[in-house]
Amino acid sequence: MDYLHQETISFEQAVCWIDKFVDEIEGNRNGLEPYPIALRGINWIKFLSKYHPYILAENKRKWDSSLYAQYQILLDNLEYHLLGNHLLEDAFSLLWAGLYFKDEPIYQKAKGLLLRELEEQLLPDGAHYEQSPMYHCILLDRLLDCYNVSVNNLRFIGQEGLNERLREKAGGMLGHLASVVYKDNTIPLLNDSAEGIAPSPTQLFAYAKRLDMDWEKLPMGACGYRKLMAGHWEAIVDVGDIRASYQPGHSHADTFNYELRIGGKPF
């Protein structure tokens, strides 16, 4: 979904890719599912904003029209059937759409959904409730992006209050991440986590610092993880309940699992 922003992709290639997608959209059933729309929408908005001076007016009108129509599909198909990170990604993307199109109904829908889902999905110790360190990093990156775009694009009355809430929730997620990482700042590969998918903790901490955020390590509690350290030994143990109880999609296989590192290497 971030194809447009890869360092090896030229501006011309990106333009061709967007044009091709728009021209073939009627036959692209999978591309019009809500989750792809949510991820693609943010990436298109980033591209359109970054390269605005170089995009032909005709292309801009064509792409904006398609993107707005895609967001109408998303609004009509929010992922309440999946909940979890999918619904949160929908809300993040709608915030970008509301700000980009200066569309208050979309913004208000995003705001309400964001405030509710952040309260529901972030635990008191700052962890995302699906207990996957990788997805925690993905969602933290998205939350930092949303705070960044919202604080720099004030469009609507009361938006500052939303920004403060986004900042507060990001601080909690940063505090949890600071506690759960190993000494080398890598994440434990529990609950569907893998390397090279999400931004690294080092990248996320640096991004948060650029946004002038501060945070403190938060003790691990509700997340169900516990860290044991002695000399060259580091262990992360998953002793918590399956969360979320109504959406165990990412904690289905790792309950009571653990990772052990000795001298910085997996045992």
Residues covered by each model-derived region:
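Carbohydrate-active enzyme catalytic cores, enriched for enzymes
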Residues: 127-267
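Aromatic-lined, polymer-binding surfaces characteristic
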Residues: 1-170
